[in-house]
Amino acid sequence: MADDMVYQEAVAAEVIQVSGRTGVTGEIFQVRCKILGGKDTGRILTRNVKGPVKVGDLIMLRETEREAKQLGKRRK
């Protein structure tokens, strides 16, 4: 089965803002990132990232078509 998998190139993106945390335990960060390569160079996306991340980090995105929904306000 591994032979049938097709390799997709990843695109580098730089984290420019950490917007907040999401997920049941807050393990997912919502970030705004600037695409550094590919057909969407210069585009700014909102993405959800798993794991620790800070402004200035480089992340590799498998695709640049989808964008995460904005976080809603927390209800009390």
Swiss-Prot record:
Cellular component, GO annotation: cytosolic small ribosomal subunit
Domain of life according to the entry: Archaea
InterPro entries linked: NA-bd_OB-fold (IPR012340), Ribosomal_eS28 (IPR000289), Ribosomal_eS28_CS (IPR028626)
Pfam families, per database record: Ribosomal_S28e
Ranges in coiled-coil conformation: none
GO molecular function: structural constituent of ribosome
Keyword Ribonucleoprotein: yes
Keywords, ordered alphabetically: Ribonucleoprotein, Ribosomal protein
Biological processes per GO annotation: maturation of SSU-rRNA; ribosomal small subunit assembly; translation
Gene3D superfamilies the record matches: Nucleic acid-binding proteins
Family: Belongs to the eukaryotic ribosomal protein eS28 family.
The protein's name: Small ribosomal subunit protein eS28
Organism listed in the record: Methanococcus vannielii (strain ATCC 35089 / DSM 1224 / JCM 13029 / OCM 148 / SB)
